[in-house]
Swiss-Prot record:
NADP(+) binds at R48, R54. The keyword NADP applies. The lineage of its organism: Bacteria, Pseudomonadati, Pseudomonadota, Gammaproteobacteria, Enterobacterales. The gene is aroC. GO terms for molecular function: chorismate synthase activity; FMN binding. Its cofactor is FMNH2. GO terms for cellular component: cytosol. Homotetramer. Its EC number is 4.2.3.5. It catalyses: 5-O-(1-carboxyvinyl)-3-phosphoshikimate = chorismate + phosphate. CDD domains: Chorismate_synthase. Keywords: Amino-acid biosynthesis, Aromatic amino acid biosynthesis, FAD, Flavoprotein, FMN, Lyase, NADP. It comes from Klebsiella pneumoniae (strain 342). It holds the Pfam family Chorismate_synt. This is Chorismate synthase.
Amino acid sequence: MAGNTIGQLFRVTTFGESHGLALGCIVDGVPPGIPLTEADLQHDLDRRRPGTSRYTTQRREPDQVKILSGVFEGVTTGTSIGLLIENTDQRSQDYGAIKDLFRPGHADYTYEQKYGLRDYRGGGRSSARETAMRVAAGAIAKKYLAAKFGIVIRGCLTQMGDIPLAIKDWNQVEQNPFFCPDPDKIDALDELMRGLKKEGDSIGAKVTVVADGVPPGLGEPVFDRLDADIAHALMSINAVKGVEIGDGFEVVKLRGSENRDEITKDGFQSNHAGGILGGISSGQQIVANIALKPTSSITVPGHTINRFGEEVEMITKGRHDPCVGIRAVPIAEAMLAIVLMDHFMRQRAQNGDVTTTIPRW
C-alpha cells in the first residue's frame, strides 16, 4: 500500500487498522523548538473520538495519544515525531459472520479485488478509525500555524440530510453534539437522529471548514495548486464524495460579473473563490465544503454477494455512526491544517525572501 503519506516538506504517514493493536503515525518536517505535549494533541482527538454522545458510535476508545519521539524537554527537536494510539475497545466477534460477505457501499469488495484478501474486522485499514492519527498530526500543524502566523482553522456541520445549517454563531459549535453553528436547528437534528436510530438507517451530511489569517502566496502551480492539494486531502477522508472550494458548484448559476471577486483599495469585495486564485492563497478566508455519504453500516437488510458469487441478504452488525459527518468536523480541520503547514514550508523554502509592494488586507 503506497498511499499512506501526505505532504512534501511537512509529511504525515499513518499506519494501523480498526481492530489492530494500535494506530500510529510519523510526522516529518516539524520545525525545532515548538512547545508540544500530548495534551496539545488530545483536545482535538477528544472532539473526534467515538462514544462521546448518543448520536455517534458507542465504541468507547479513550484515544490517548503517546508521543514516542521528536520531543525533548517539552519542545520539538526537528526530528521525526512518532505518535501512537492503542485500540482498547475492539469487538471483532461482531464481524465474524461477514468475513465471506462484501458489505454493500463499503470497501470490502474493492480491497479484496486489489489485494486478494482483506481484514474484515471493522473494515481494517479502510475504516475511519485511521483518521485519529490525522487529527493528532493536524493538531501539531494547527498549533504551529496559530502561534507563528495567527491562523485559525475551524469547521462545522452545515447540512444534515435536507436540513441546512447556517453559520450563525461559531461559539455554538462546541456547545452541542452536532458541531452545529445554528442553535435554532438543534432540536430538528435531534429529532432526525432519533428517527434514524429507530429505523436502523443513516444520513449524509455537509461539513464546512475555513481558515482565517492565511497570507497571500501559498500554493505551487500548476499541479500542486493550493486548492488542488486541499481537495486531495479532504477527498481522502472516509465517506467524502464531493469537495467544493469557495462557492463550488454554485458558480454554474453565476455570471462572470457576479462571480469575480472585485478589488478596491479597501480589499476584496467578495469571496466566491474561497480565498484561492490561480491555485494561490489570496489572503482572504479559505473556505471548503465536503459532502459525506450516509454510512452503509445499517441494520436495514440489504443485498450483496459472498466471495463465492452467491447472492445473500445481510444486516451489518457492530457499532456505527448514524451520521459520519458529525465526527468528520475535526478530521476536515486537521487535513486543511496539514496542507497549509506543508505549503508554508514549501513557500519558505523557495520564496522566503520575496517581498512585494502590493497591498495586503
